Amino acid sequence: MSSSSPGEPLEPTDQDLDVLLKNLGNLVTPMALRVAATLRLVDHLLAGADTLAGLADRTDTHPQALSRLVRHLTVVGVLEGGEKQGRPLRPTRLGMLLADGHPAQQRAWLDLNGAVSHADLAFTGLLDVVRTGRPAYAGRYGRPFWEDLSADVALADSFDALMSCDEDLAYEAPADAYDWSAVRHVLDVGGGNGGMLAAIALRAPHLRGTLVELAGPAERARRRFADAGLADRVTVAEGDFFKPLPVTADVVLLSFVLLNWSDEDALTILRGCVRALEPGGRLLVLDRADVEGDGADRFFSTLLDLRMLTFMGGRVRTRDEVVDLAGSAGLALASERTSGSTTLPFDFSILEFTAVSEEAAPAAQASEALPAQE
C-alpha cells in the first residue's frame, strides 16, 4: 500500500486506472450511445426486431458493423441477450432510457441529428478552444451556433423540443415567480420560440408583449402565439439584439440569453436593453445565477459551462458575476427571487434591475427614438 505526505497527490490505484480507461478517457462508448440513439435501436427492439438481422433491416445498417456496435452496447450494460446467449436481444433497465417515449428524453438529447448532440461533436475542437478562447462550432459547421439554428429548420425544431421538453420547468415556474400585475408591456429580447413570453401573457391578460429574435425562431414564435390565441397582444419583431431594439417597454426580459455570450457581448446586450427601458422600467434577467458557482450539481454546472464555451463562446456565471456585469451596463439590483423550480440540475433565479443614471439609461431620449407600446 503506497503512502504519501500530506498535500502530495496519492498514487493512483488499479481501480483509478479502470475508471480513467472505461469512463473518463473513453470516447467509444459515448459515440456508441449516440449512434444507438440516432438509429433508435431500443425502439426497434421494443417493436419486435429482437435479432441482429431484424435490427439491421429496420435501421438500414451494415449487419456486421451493427453486430459489433451491439456487442459493445451489451458489454457496457445498455443491451442484453442475443443469439449467442440464446435469448432475444433487448434493452436493459439502463438501456430503456434510450426509448423515445421515456420522460428523461435521453434519446433525443443523444440523437446526432438533433441540435445538442450535433453541437457536441464540436468538442473535438476543445483543444483549440482552450488555446484560443474562441468557440469551435463555427469552425466545424461553417457558421455560428445561433445562425445555424436560424437557418436549419430541423436543427431548430429539435433544439426547441429539447429546451421545452418540460414546459413547467422551462416556462411556467419562472412565469409564476414574478408579479406581472403592474406591467404594461414586456419586451422579450432573444426569446426563442416564444415559450416564456406566451406563459407570461397567458398569466397576465392585461399586458402586451414584443419578442425580438432572428428570422427562424421568430417565425416559430409567431406560430406559438397564434396557436395560444395571443396574436392580438403579442407581436414578433425580427431583429438582431446587438442592434438597437425596435420598441421600448416598462419590462425588458433576458431569459437564458447572457450565458450564451462572452462578457463583452453580454455587456453589449445589456446596454441595448437599458436603452430600451422606459422611465422607471425594470430589466429582468432569468439565468443560471447561483451564489457559489457550483449549482445544485457541480457536474451539470461545469458541463453546461464548457458547452457554452465550445458552442458559442459563452459562459455560466455566478449570481455575483451577473450583478457585476449588469453594474457595468449602468444597472443596479433591485430584487431577486427563485424561479419556482426545485428540480433543475442547476440553480437559477430571476434578477430584477433598474437603471442607476440618466447617462447609463437615457430612457427619455430612447423613447423618442423608439416607439413605446402601451
Swiss-Prot record:
S-adenosyl-L-methionine binds at Y171, G190, E213, D240, F241, S255. This is Aclacinomycin 10-hydroxylase RdmB. Pathway: Antibiotic biosynthesis; rhodomycin biosynthesis; Antibiotic biosynthesis; aclacinomycin biosynthesis. Belongs to the class I-like SAM-binding methyltransferase superfamily. Cation-independent O-methyltransferase family. SUPFAM superfamilies: S-adenosyl-L-methionine-dependent methyltransferases, Winged helix' DNA-binding domain. The lineage of its organism: Bacteria, Bacillati, Actinomycetota, Actinomycetes, Kitasatosporales. The hydroxylation reaction requires S-adenosyl-L-methionine (SAM) as a cofactor. S-adenosine-L-homocysteine and sinefungin (a SAM analog) can also support the decarboxylative hydroxylation activity with 10-carboxy-13-deoxycarminomycin as substrate. InterPro entries: COMT-like, O_MeTrfase_dom, Plant_O-MeTrfase_dimerisation, SAM-dependent_MTases_sf, WH-like_DNA-bd_sf, WH_DNA-bd_sf. It catalyses: 15-demethylaclacinomycin T + AH2 + O2 = 10-decarboxymethylaclacinomycin T + A + CO2 + H2O; 10-carboxy-13-deoxycarminomycin + AH2 + O2 + H(+) = 10-hydroxy-13-deoxycarminomycin + A + CO2 + H2O; 10-hydroxy-13-deoxycarminomycin + S-adenosyl-L-methionine = 10-hydroxy-13-deoxydaunorubicin + S-adenosyl-L-homocysteine + H(+). GO terms for molecular function: carboxy-lyase activity; O-methyltransferase activity; protein dimerization activity. The gene is rdmB. Contains an N-terminal domain involved in dimerization, a middle domain and C-terminal catalytic domain that binds S-adenosyl-L-methionine. Keywords: Antibiotic biosynthesis, Lyase, Methyltransferase, S-adenosyl-L-methionine, Transferase. Gene3D superfamilies: 1.10.287.1350, Vaccinia Virus protein VP39 (3.40.50.150), Winged helix-like DNA-binding domain superfamily/Winged helix DNA-binding domain (1.10.10.10). It comes from Streptomyces purpurascens.
